[in-house]
Regions:
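Charged catalytic cores and adjacent phosphate/nucleic-acid-binding surfaces used
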Residues: 1-15, 19, 30-35, 98-110, ...
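An N-terminally biased module of ancient metal coordination in phosphate/nucleic-acid-related enzymes
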Residues: 1-97, 205-207
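Short, solvent-exposed loop/turn segments at secondary-structure boundaries
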Residues: 23-28, 59, 114-117, 174-177
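Conserved beta-strand positions in the central sheet of alpha/beta enzyme cores
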Residues: 45-47, 138-139, 163
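Glycine-rich tight-turn/loop motif centered on a GG-T
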Residues: 64-65, 110-116
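Well-ordered, non-membrane alpha-helical segments in soluble/globular domains
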Residues: 65-78, 119-124, 179-183
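Extracellular glycoside hydrolase catalytic/binding regions
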Residues: 142-145
Length: 255
């Protein structure tokens, strides 16, 4: 990481992370992910496991409250470990709609239990529900092309921002979904609709890429993160290999 950028923006957050307790595609537990991220130098992480509409590890036939309790275990284990080692851990999830996915921030498991209608909510209804709770909806990797994504669908009116930098697309260490064009198109889409841009690693194991969003100050909560993104606070983005300004432009001279 470039030392000058690191000095100006010392608080790095992983915004897209999966755990094996809750995401069927993840290889590492919440506690293992927390330890790896702390060792890497992250200030905090957002646990964003796949929900019922995506690659969840939780039995969809369970009663709703029980499903939520088990779904939250990845976050809870990461949070318990983070509290011990000095890593901030925040709750979120990745909502799936036949391959189109959204990162949800600013709500918690208790709120989910109170809103079982989430399971059948449309993209538009999801946005309204999350907003009523003061949350944030980010369109995850909108231009990724994979077998599990039958078509690219865009919802600029029903998101608060776009994950323009996804480290699995652009970090040289990535062995899956690796195509920088996905990010270039996502950034262009965000600019066209004047939507804030975020970054994350979409990480599923302890071999970290180092992607995320870095701030000049330490975040106090998920709500604080939402405010920072929505109000245009000063931050930078990274895929772990390059740094970008908040508009998705490569910061020249970084390494």
């Amino acid at each position: 990481m470039d030392e000058l950028i690191w000095e100006k923006y010392p608080y790095l957050y992983e915004t897209h992370l999966h755990t094996s307790e809750s995401s069927a595609c993840s290889r590492s537990t919440g506690a293992e992910m927390a330890r790896a991220c702390k060792e890497y130098g992250y200030t905090g992480i957002f646990v964003t496991d796949h929900n019922w509409g995506g690659n969840t590890a939780v039995d969809r036939s369970l009663p709703w409250d029980e499903w939520v309790d088990i779904f939250a275990l990845g976050y809870e284990h990461a949070k318990a470990e983070g509290d011990q080692i000095g890593l901030d851990v925040f709750f979120g999830y990745e909502a799936g709609y036949q391959g189109t996915e959204f990162l949800i921030y600013g709500i918690d498991a208790a709120w989910m239990k109170d809103h079982p209608e989430l399971v059948k909510a449309t993209v538009e209804e999801q946005y309204c529900l999350v907003h009523e709770a003061g949350g944030l909806v980010i369109h995850a990797h909108p231009y990724r092309e994979e077998a599990y994504i039958p078509e690219i669908r865009l919802y600029p009116e029903w998101v608060d921002g776009v994950e323009g930098i996804n480290a699995t697309h652009s970090n040289p260490q990535s062995t899956g979904h690796n195509d920088p064009q996905y990010d270039l198109r996502a950034v262009a889409y965000a600019r066209e609709h004047k939507l804030p841009i975020s970054a994350g690693s979409d990480i599923h194991g302890t071999h970290l890429f180092g992607g995320g969003v870095a701030f000049r100050r330490k975040l106090t909560s998920v709500a604080d993160y939402a405010r920072a993104i929505l109000t245009g606070e000063d931050y930078v983005l990274t895929d772990g290999a390059k740094w970008y300004d908040k508009f998705g432009n490569v910061i020249e001279g970084n390494r």
